């Protein structure tokens, strides 16, 4: 337990026979339950986990193996673990990938904001950790930074970065609100989940943690397939959030600003294409065409910035700043001392 809260860790696995044993063997002492979810791995992942379960005896946390009959994606694997943790009424459920890229020594820093009631969901942020630029492969850093910017707009959590991290912790109350069957099942799962959390006005903490690479993990990313899917997913989830949060549940004029930004943006593209076509055909840039294009482009930018500002202000109260990783403390210590946790007084 962590400060009187039960803690489970979901470990999604796909072809991690060389890595998953290390993850299970280094699980922190305060973890009560480990839910390993095998996503139909064709390698020996299941056998490795079963050997660990047989050999652990009474040492360490309880380990439960859950299996998918077919490969459904990392998001589906995590949601399978979430559903089991929710069924068991576990207070806090964290996620640690089976490839060993998530430092178990930092799990307490991730769990603490949720255990202490400061956040409903906490996620790692590797991009802002000192030295991250030199540790994270350059193409991953830049790609993650771009997707993080797009996720800010789609989700409404403007303070978060490193949107693609899977190192997270969530409260039981948050899990009770979520429709786990509807969550995106594959690589875009963390982005989709943030959008759904925002719909319920749940607080999200961004915890700066050390990035871990080159520990034997094998990347399963396929950029040519992921980029088109992620672009469509973020656009679709953004539009869904606008409809659900600012039209159906409560009206806010920011949807009109976003709509105006989209309309004038499309108009500016049309005028620009016409301008270029006429310049190629005649060698002359029509003055009126250029003026209208400039006006629509400027209007689109202004409408979009106003809409973002409105959205940022509407969601500012969901921002949970975590300045430094707080240490874990034995259950009951806070009650015995009668003191507030460091950094939370007032």
Language model features with spans:
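A conserved acidic beta->alpha catalytic loop
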Residues: 38-47, 70, 100
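Short helix-capping segments at alpha-helix termini
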Residues: 54-61, 89
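Short hydrophobic beta-strand elements that form part
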Residues: 8-12, 35, 67
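Acceptor/aglycone-binding surface of glycosyltransferases and processive sugar-polymer synthases
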Residues: 66-87, 92-95, 104-187, 213-228
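N-proximal low-complexity "stem/linker" segments adjacent to membrane-targeting elements
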Residues: 1-26
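Cell-envelope/extracellular polymer assembly enzymes that use nucleotide-activated donors
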Residues: 6-8, 33, 192
């Amino acid at each position: 337990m962590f400060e009187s809260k039960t803690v489970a860790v979901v470990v999604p696995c796909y072809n991690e026979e060389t890595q998953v044993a290390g993850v299970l063997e280094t699980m922190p002492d305060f973890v009560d339950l480990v839910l390993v979810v095998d996503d139909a791995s064709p390698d020996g992942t299941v056998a490795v986990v079963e050997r660990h379960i047989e050999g652990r005896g009474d040492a360490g946390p309880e380990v439960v193996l859950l299996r998918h009959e077919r490969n459904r994606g990392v998001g589906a694997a995590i949601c399978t673990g979430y559903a089991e943790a929710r069924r068991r009424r576990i207070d806090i459920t964290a996620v640690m990938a089976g490839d060993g890229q998530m430092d178990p020594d930092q799990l307490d820093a991730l769990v603490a904001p949720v255990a202490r009631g400061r956040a409903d969901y906490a996620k790692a942020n590797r991009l802002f950790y000192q030295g991250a630029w030199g540790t994270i492969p350059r193409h991953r850093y830049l790609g993650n930074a771009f997707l993080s910017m797009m996720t800010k707009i789609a989700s409404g959590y403007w303070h978060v970065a490193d949107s693609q991290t899977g190192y997270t912790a969530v409260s039981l109350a948050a899990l009770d609100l979520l429709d786990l069957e509807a969550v995106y099942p594959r690589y875009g799962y963390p982005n989709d989940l943030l959008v759904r959390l925002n719909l319920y006005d749940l607080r999200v903490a961004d915890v700066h943690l050390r990035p871990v690479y080159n520990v034997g993990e094998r990347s399963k990313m396929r950029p040519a397939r992921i980029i088109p899917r992620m672009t469509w997913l973020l656009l679709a989830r953004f539009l869904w959030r606008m409809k659900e949060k600012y039209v159906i549940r409560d009206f806010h004029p920011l949807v009109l600003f976003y709509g105006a930004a989209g309309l004038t943006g499309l108009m500016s593209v049309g005028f620009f294409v016409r301008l270029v076509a006429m310049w190629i055909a005649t060698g002359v840039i029509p003055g009126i065409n250029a003026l209208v294009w400039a006006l629509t482009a400027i209007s689109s930018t202004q409408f979009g910035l106003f809409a973002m500002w409105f959205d940022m202000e509407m969601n500012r109260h969901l921002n949970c700043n975590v300045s430094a990783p707080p240490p874990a403390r034995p259950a009951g210590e806070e009650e015995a001392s009668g003191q507030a946790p460091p950094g939370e007084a007032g």
